């Protein structure tokens, strides 16, 4: 993988918004399809969020709420309660490694390497 600073030539605000959106979608849906480089960077973001959610204290809730889109829903399910009540309890006995990256064929339009990132 090339230097990440050369891959993403956007400002920090753009990076933050993209990875907020990707992390929120991954938590709600369990898997998403994205480019391989974004999947690799998203893995560290999501694993840190799940580790914080496992603590389940007020400080962890506030830190996660400041990062995720808390009001985004899927079929009426809000992401914050879903993360703390459904996702985090699944990984109480697991120390990291909450995600899996599966490579898929390249995108036809620009031949970008694609991957599916999913919660284990």
From Swiss-Prot:
Coiled-coil portions: none
Superkingdom assignment: Bacteria
NCBIfam families: L17 (TIGR00059)
Pfam families to which the protein is assigned, alphabetical: Ribosomal_L17
GO term, biological process aspect, one: translation
Keyword Ribosomal protein: yes
Tagged with keyword Mitochondrion: no
One GO cellular component, as annotated: cytosolic large ribosomal subunit
Name listed for the protein in its UniProt record: Large ribosomal subunit protein bL17
Subunit organization: Part of the 50S ribosomal subunit. Contacts protein L32.
Similarity remark: Belongs to the bacterial ribosomal protein bL17 family.
InterPro entries registered for this protein in UniProt: Ribosomal_bL17, Ribosomal_bL17_CS, Ribosomal_bL17_sf
Organism: Mesomycoplasma hyopneumoniae (strain J / ATCC 25934 / NCTC 10110) (Mycoplasma hyopneumoniae)
Keywords on record: Ribonucleoprotein, Ribosomal protein
Disulfide bonds listed in the record: none
One MF annotation (Gene Ontology) recorded for this entry: structural constituent of ribosome
